[in-house]
């Protein structure tokens, strides 16, 4: 079964490679300038390069009973330890003629929400940095926690900060806040590396917080 350290290592390796590519191409802006939604494909590629199955934007299992597939809460990415997996298994079709042989049960997959926050943007210091870090992120934890069909899940928090010290301090502050609110969040599997400072960010922190089974 996949673990937060496995996922953190895979994503860090992929983002390091992207940082090196930005430097080689002498890009005016690095990948830290990208909007969160545009960073998701980088995370997906990193996981695939590690030989993992990647299923972006999957509906939460508790919402599968909704006949309208376009509706319901969605998880940023669902990960399996087999890149050959063709799909996630719908519990409603398990054991029926409509079941998919190579599908992965939702209970066996790793459900990951992604959040990225940058201390600096192309417009300068991000004034909403602290609020963005401490408020919406906790909402993702609650979504994972609330679904009874999710056994393995976590939150990926990618921080772009001026220094390593800032990142480590802010990750600890976020974790401490979750504990004080009673969220079932485990200590993070945290990684980090220097990035070329183009807009004010000199450090990329990658942290995966396990949410269930802690």
Stretch-by-stretch model annotation:
Residues 1-19, 106, 128-150:
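An N-terminal amphipathic alpha-helical segment
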Residues 1-51:
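Interdomain/boundary linker segments immediately adjacent to catalytic/signaling cores
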Residues 48-92:
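A short acidic/basic microdomain associated with nuclease active sites
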Residues 62-66, 94-101, 129, 140-145:
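Short secondary-structure capping micro-motifs at structural edges
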Residues 77-83, 106-124:
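Conserved catalytic cores of phosphodiester-cleaving nucleases, focusing on short active-site segments
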Residues 88-109:
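A recognition module on extended beta-rich or small alphabeta surfaces enriched in W/G with H and D/E
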Residues 118-183:
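Acidic, metal/cofactor-coordinating or nucleic-acid-engaging core segments within structured domains
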Residues 160-214:
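Non-catalytic C-terminal interaction segments of nucleic acid-processing enzymes
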């Amino acid at each position: 079964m996949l673990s937060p350290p496995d996922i953190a290592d895979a994503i860090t390796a992929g983002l390091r490679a992207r940082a090196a590519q930005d430097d080689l191409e002498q890009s005016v802006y690095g990948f830290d300038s990208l909007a969160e939604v545009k960073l998701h494909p980088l995370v997906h590629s990193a996981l695939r390069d590690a030989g993992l199955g990647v299923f972006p934007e999957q509906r939460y299992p508790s919402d599968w009973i909704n006949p309208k597939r376009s509706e319901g809460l969605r998880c940023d990415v669902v990960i399996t330890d087999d890149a050959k997996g063709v799909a996630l298994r719908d519990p409603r079709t398990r054991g029926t003629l409509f079941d998919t042989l190579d599908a992965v049960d939702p209970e066996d997959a790793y459900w990951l929400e992604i959040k990225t926050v940058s201390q600096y943007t192309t417009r300068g210091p991000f004034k909403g940095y602290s609020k963005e870090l401490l408020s919406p992120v906790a909402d993702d934890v609650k979504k994972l926690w609330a679904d009874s069909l999710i056994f393995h899940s976590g939150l990926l928090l990618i921080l772009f900060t001026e220094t390593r010290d800032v990142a480590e301090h802010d990750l600890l502050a976020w974790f401490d806040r979750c504990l004080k609110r009673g969220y079932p969040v485990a200590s993070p599997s945290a990684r980090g590396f220097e990035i070329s400072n183009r807009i004010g960010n000199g450090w990329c922190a990658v942290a995966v917080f396990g949410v269930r089974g802690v």
